[in-house]
Amino acid sequence: MSLRKKAAASVIAIAATFSLAACGGNDEDVIKVGTTDQGQEQWQVFQEEAKAQGLNLELVPFSDYSLPNRALEEGQIDVNNFQHLMFLADYNVNSDANLTPIGATEIIPLALYFKDHSELKDVEEAGEVAIPNDPTNQGRALHMLANAGLLELKDKSLLSPTPADVDTAKSKVKVTPVDAAQTVTSYPDGTPSVINNSFLSNGNIDPKSAVAQDDPSAPAAEPFINAFVTTEERKDDEDLKKLVDVWHSQKVQDAIDRQTEGTSVEVKKDGKELDEILTGIEGKIKDAK
């Protein structure tokens, strides 16, 4: 099946997922947490550890990055944990929203995978790379591929470049934007793919098998700090803040380490620190318009 047909089929599945999520109950004692990688081990451990702290959680799964923030704004969930600050800034600016980070979790590398291959020259020979099509992860993917020497950007200073910013004449590969969840299904078909860590388990992909990746510990990675996010009205909710502490508990961190094969970098920053970073990113996005 072609990448385009797969992306179209994914839209149908996404719509069904959102409909189911929107039909949930309204038990005020339950904290609804939106995520895109519920099947990963750390979420079960997180839910158990939260329960031990007197917090009853319902994990609400989404199969597309565009939905958890919309669900948060519409009151279908109380908080989400799936996105980095760059993604949140882009959403806030382009949706005229004011969603707020309340605590950092980690930075996870964005990496390039190619089934049964481990060298960049193999990717060059393939000639095509599937990348996430959401603006922020797409831009991050393009910067990563440029740093790996696979493509050339016309302007390397762009915060979130698009495929139109690629100098195709000087590049060794072409890029095909697809839904982020679709990158993992492109991988077994023999297409080199830039895949977010949250989808690796769906394709039984070893995080350490990456052909190339960005550096999550570098200062330039700060916009890609992942965080718990809620609405402006609930940013001081003590129960929601407790979730951040639970996430940084040893048992949850051990589960994350196992899941990511030690590739993620834990980050401890509070809502105020994150908001300062977020404000700066939002300003750059607005200036680029």
Segments (PLM) and residue ranges:
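A bilobed periplasmic-binding-protein/Venus flytrap-type ligand-binding module shared by bacterial periplasmic
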Residues: 109-121, 224-242
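C-terminal motif of bacterial Sec signal peptides marking the signal peptidase cleavage site
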Residues: 18-22
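An extracytoplasmic/periplasmic, membrane-proximal ligand-sensing/linker region
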Residues: 31, 38-42, 52, 190, ...
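Beta->alpha turn/N-cap motifs
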Residues: 64-65, 75-89, 106, 179-180, ...
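Short, well-ordered beta-strand elements
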Residues: 28-38, 55-61, 127-129
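Ligand-binding "clamshell"
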Residues: 90-102, 117, 189, 194, ...
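Short helix-initiation/N-cap motifs at beta->coil->alpha
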Residues: 59-70, 157-185
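A conserved helix-loop-strand patch within extracytoplasmic ligand-binding domains
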Residues: 102-152
